[in-house]
Amino acid sequence: MNGLGGLNKSEHGVVIGLVQLQLPVVVTKEDLAKQTEKIVWMVGKARRNLGTMDLVVFPEYSLHGLSMDTNPEIMCRLDGPEVAAFKQACIDNKIWGCFSIMEYNPDGNPYNSGLIIDSNGEIKLYYRKLHPWIPVEPWEPGDLGIPVIEGPRGAKIALIICHDGMFPEMARECAYKGAEIMIRTAGYTAPIRDSWRFTNQANAFQNLMVTANVCMCGSDGSFDSMGEGMIVNFDGSILAHGTTGRADEIITAEVRPDLVREARIGWGVENNIYQLWHRGYVAVKGGAMDCPYTFMHDMVAGTYRLPWEDQVKITDGTSCGFPAPTRVFGKMAKAAE
């Protein structure tokens, strides 16, 4: 059930629209301004398309296209005109919106950032992509963690970006922090189609969490994006799926965060987000509450290392034309100082 794409909205439903936006080419500030206008127009289309819609979601790269250009002239700032236009579009159309920007970083490479703006034009969620699609993408690794917010109609919402969703730990973190709906925006192209589909479903099922996922669409003359808007219910079943590859189509469905809450509390079989920390509770009271996973201990200790670590051949972006980096990240950078 998806309420006929949100046409029939139930008392506790949240209607989501996923914009399979036509892939643009953005090189200049003028291109950026033109694409900003296109996105603003599409926010209006979303409202005209479906009066019941609560949240409209735009894909990763919707503003900048699939260029890896880090030219500061076309990078965005939170107080810049592009974000201001998105805020006003949400106000004008009385709708929440999820947007993608490549964000200027004075201390390194730009961030690949995502914003959720409410219907009053306020930024409610600000996220920087944790896992850039290496070795292809040059973006700075995110440093803000994964925020979870209270979205439209009280739904708990998280946002991850593209390659993030290939790491099961990302979806688990969203759910662990309370997310009932996880948005995944992407710029993926056709070769990733199968991986895209099964990870969207797995991320939902393993965490009893709705996932709402969308890519860019169409061709820019070099790359062919696939659209593939998918709204997946918390049991892994697909509620809506854009399979035609039609650019600027908006894929819609009603989702039910209240049923997510009910499942997380009431399910026995396959309540995996709970059972991870309560292994074998039939045999031992409360289950085994330990951490048997070596990789988790090693990550916390800063000693994560694969058995084949020294054999990995691609460890920077030089194969894709980027210079080898010299800076280090986070605690390592502070220690070096």
Swiss-Prot record:
The active site is at residues 60, 129, 162. GO terms for biological process: putrescine biosynthetic process from arginine. PROSITE patterns: CN_HYDROLASE. InterPro entries: Aliph_Amidase/BUP, C-N_Hydrolase, C-N_Hydrolase_sf, Formamidase. The keyword Hydrolase applies. One of its GO terms (molecular function) is N-carbamoylputrescine amidase activity. Belongs to the carbon-nitrogen hydrolase superfamily. Aliphatic amidase family. HAMAP family: Formamidase. This is Formamidase. The gene is amiF.
